[in-house]
Curated annotation (Swiss-Prot):
Residues 145-173 are annotated as: Disordered. It is a single-pass type II membrane protein. Belongs to the CcmE/CycJ family. The keyword Transport does not apply. This is Cytochrome c-type biogenesis protein CcmE. The gene is ccmE. It comes from the Bacteria. The chain crosses the membrane at residues 9-29.
Length: 173
């Protein structure tokens, strides 16, 4: 026969194991619904697996926006940069009215197979003269492209590291 003290200890241990298992299962299930933020530099360094949904934020790189239609739907390609790296983005749908080159955006989507393009399902554009999404602001600070004590974010159009001919060739080829 077990003493009361040992029985109480076993009950506490069993409850602890049960609670730990429940928390672990809950966190595992919750992880699949999370959408992490990444900057273009982080995407280039980490190469997230195709199909994994995450947020990509930065500045729309100058001279990279190409709009058209595909199967009757609006279709847009552009590049998002943080000043250190740029990632090509493909979006099918109507862009927000405030979307333009040199502005901050956050896109939600996943990398396509082959790790070549980010397939965005949602594009969120900057709204307001002084607004900058916090994650984009942190990525720009880390890249050394912006320090808020020196004023508004820099003109992202100055970050264009390709000629228009190179951009057109990379968008079509």
């Amino acid at each position: 026969m077990m003493s009361r003290k040992k029985r109480r200890l076993w009950i506490v241990i069993a409850c602890g194991i049960g609670l730990s298992t429940a928390v672990a299962l809950m966190l595992f299930a919750f992880r699949s619904s999370l959408s992490f933020f990444m900057s273009p530099e982080q995407v280039a360094a980490r190469h997230p697996p195709p199909g994994r949904v995450f947020r990509l934020g930065g500045i729309v790189q100058a001279n990279t926006v190409v709009m058209g239609t595909r199967n009757g739907a609006p279709y847009t390609t552009f590049r998002i940069t943080d000043g250190r790296a740029s990632i090509p983005v493909v979006y099918t749908g109507v862009l927000p009215g405030l979307f333009r080159q040199g502005q901050g955006v956050v896109t939600i989507g996943a990398m396509a197979k082959g790790d070549s393009e980010f397939m965005a399902s949602t594009v969120l554009a900057k709204h307001g003269a002084d607004y900058m999404p916090r994650d984009v602001e942190m990525a720009l600070r880390k890249a050394g492209k912006w320090n808020p004590k020196f004023g508004p974010p820099p003109n992202a159009g100055a970050w264009d590291d390709k000629s228009p001919a190179q951009i057109e060739a990379s968008n079509n080829g």
